[in-house]
A protein has these predicted regions:
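A short, basic/flexible loop-to-alpha-helix module at the beginning of a structural domain
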Residues: 91-102
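Histidine-anchored nucleotide/phosphate-binding helix
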Residues: 115-126
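Short active-site oxyanion
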Residues: 26, 105-106, 194-197
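Ferredoxin-reductase
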Residues: 1-84, 140, 169
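Short, compositionally biased
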Residues: 50-61, 100-112, 216
Length: 229
């Protein structure tokens, strides 16, 4: 299967939002939270990298991704150089990082482009009668709060959705939460125990949050995660 780039745009320094279409299918089937893999030959070597879907299934062959340019990277520089109409080999979406059914109140914890699968999940599952969701999103700088306007609009429309952006390196104008996401877990949990937790981001953050949650007495079956280096 091949993917053809429709358009891409910068949404933060060194971060781009991509819209692709999967060729050869009328509808690309996947569950919100899953990932696809791209493959290309770079420097004579076949390189494959996995990227989380950043959109809910659209009922068409189109899908969206959110990628940061890794320097030095193997595949991301190639993707950042792609022009509309360019093609790249892709695989059918896979992955187990999806919302457990039946869904219940959940806390989504993500850093950087690890917010992508949560955008997919929220687009698909957040509605007037859905469980309550909290998105605890950590980045260094305010300029890297990806999809901020979308999440803020969701929080206005659906009072049972809470968007909690957190900056680890804020400037003097920032009035929101500060530090790492781990510091705000207890506030997000309140006194609730009937919760599920979804963790996506760098390995260090995911491991730290898992340890905190286990220390608070939550069962490992309540904790779902996807991590990367």
């Amino acid at each position: 299967m091949e993917a053809r780039l429709i358009e891409s745009r910068e949404i933060a320094p060194a971060v781009r939002h991509f819209e692709f279409e999967a060729l050869g299918v009328e509808r690309l089937e996947f569950a919100p939270g899953q990932f696809t893999s791209f493959t290309d030959v770079i420097g004579g070597k076949e390189i494959t990298r996995a990227y989380s879907m950043a959109s809910a299934p659209l009922g068409t062959n189109r899908f969206e991704l959110c990628l940061n340019r890794v320097e030095p990277g193997h595949l991301s520089p190639r993707l950042f150089e792609m022009k509309p109409g360019d093609r790249i080999e892709m695989r059918q979406p896979l992955g187990m990082f999806v919302l457990r059914q039946p869904a219940r109140d959940s806390i989504f914890i993500g850093t950087g482009t690890g917010v992508a699968p949560y955008r997919s999940m929220l687009q698909a599952h957040l509605h007037a009668s859905s469980p309550g969701f909290t998105l605890l999103f950590g980045v260094r700088y305010e300029s890297h709060l990806l999809y901020r306007t979308e999440f803020e609009a969701m929080a206005i429309e659906y009072p049972h959705f809470r968007f909690w952006p957190t900056l680890s390196r804020p400037d003097s104008t920032w009035k929101g939460r500060q530090g790492h996401v781990q510091a705000h877990l207890a506030e997000a949990i309140e006194d609730r125990r009937n919760l599920d937790f979804y963790l996506c981001g760098l390995k260090e953050m995911v491991d730290d949050v898992r340890a905190v949650l286990k220390g608070l007495g939550f069962d490992r079956k309540q904790i779902f995660y996807e991590k990367y280096d």
